[in-house]
Regions:
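Glycine-rich phosphate/pyrophosphate-binding loop and the adjoining helix
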Residues: 71-115
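Helix-loop-strand module that forms the ligand-binding subsite of alpha/beta enzymes
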Residues: 1-75
């Protein structure tokens, strides 16, 4: 595989604990870095959903942080193991999204992961 896609809902400004556990178990010294580079040159693509709308994830928004900032730990891990960090695919406002918006997001998702 040339690409690793991590798809998850955003809970409390982070990824679910199970994804963090996966990172701890898989991205290890001797396999992903420090002597071996199994992920080097591969692309890391995040697919993330948020219940809150995008306006809340701005410097001047309710959460005072951007999604780019909140997802930066994934970018740092990608850099550490020699991966290419791709622009995340975000679907925001899922708590109130309508059918038309959801259908468009689904079509955009297919394009994003097949790109």
């Amino acid at each position: 595989a040339d690409r690793v896609i991590l798809q998850f809902p955003f809970y409390w400004y982070s990824s679910p604990a199970l994804l963090k556990e996966w990172e701890d178990e898989v991205i290890t010294a001797g396999w992903a870095y420090a002597g071996a580079h199994a992920l080097k040159g591969k692309e890391l693509k995040l697919v993330v959903t948020t219940g809150s709308d995008a306006a809340k994830y701005r410097k001047d928004g309710e959460y005072s942080h951007t999604m780019e900032e909140l997802l930066s730990p994934f970018e740092v891990v990608a850099y550490k193991v020699g991966m290419n960090y791709a622009e995340p695919f975000l679907v925001q406002g899922t708590a109130t999204i309508g059918d038309a918006e959801l259908n468009q997001a689904a079509a955009d998702y297919v394009s994003a992961i097949l790109d």
